[in-house]
């Protein structure tokens, strides 16, 4: 039986802004929820007679990352700055994140490395990471950085306008 182009099972290598984000622990999840609006007619009562699409309610890729380097933490945490042997975190408010977004790529992993076949890669054209840090220190608890990449539609001109993601090689 044929497998999906992006593979049926297995981990992936996560690349954002041309940097490998780090190792994951648990499932990397892709969530797209399409929004719709009901169309009704008085003659049919409360029964909907059609649906109209209204874009996506949410577009997210969630990465439970672990064992991050300081450089990786700086890359995926908004307003974090790496200085010598530390990372400093600064408060920020009012910044537009679309302009800071970059391409996110999920590459299926085989033997601990990304598969070379770009036909199996999943590209998200414009994505920005939001880190939710809930770190526990315990005998059995591994520390995890939950990173949720918000995916935006391309606002460029031409054939990629509105494009959010694609499976296969990058657009030339």
Spans of model-derived segments:
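Short, cysteine-centered beta-strand-loop-beta hairpins and adjacent loop/turn segments enriched
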Residues: 68-75, 114, 155-159
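Mature extracellular/passenger domains of Gram-negative fimbrial/pilin and adhesin proteins
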Residues: 28-32, 118, 161
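Acidic, glycine-rich flexible loop segments
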Residues: 97-137
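Beta-strand secondary-structure signal
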Residues: 60-64, 103-107, 146-150
């Amino acid at each position: 039986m044929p497998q999906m182009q992006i593979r049926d099972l297995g981990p992936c290598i996560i690349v954002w802004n041309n940097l490998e984000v780090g190792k994951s622990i648990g499932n990397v999840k892709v969530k797209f929820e399409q929004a719709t609006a009901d169309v009704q007619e008085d003659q049919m009562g409360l029964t909907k007679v059609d649906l109209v699409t209204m874009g996506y309610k949410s577009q997210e890729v969630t990465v439970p990352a672990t064992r991050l380097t300081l450089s990786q933490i700086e890359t995926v945490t908004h307003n974090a700055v790496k200085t010598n042997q530390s990372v400093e975190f600064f408060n920020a408010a009012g910044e537009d994140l679309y302009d800071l977004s970059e391409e996110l790529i999920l590459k299926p992993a085989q033997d601990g490395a990304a598969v070379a076949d770009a036909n199996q890669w999943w590209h998200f054209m414009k994505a920005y990471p939001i880190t939710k840090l809930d770190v526990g220190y315990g005998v059995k608890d591994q520390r995890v950085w939950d990173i949720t990449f918000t995916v935006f539609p391309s606002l460029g001109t031409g054939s990629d306008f509105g494009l959010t993601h694609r499976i296969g090689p990058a657009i030339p």
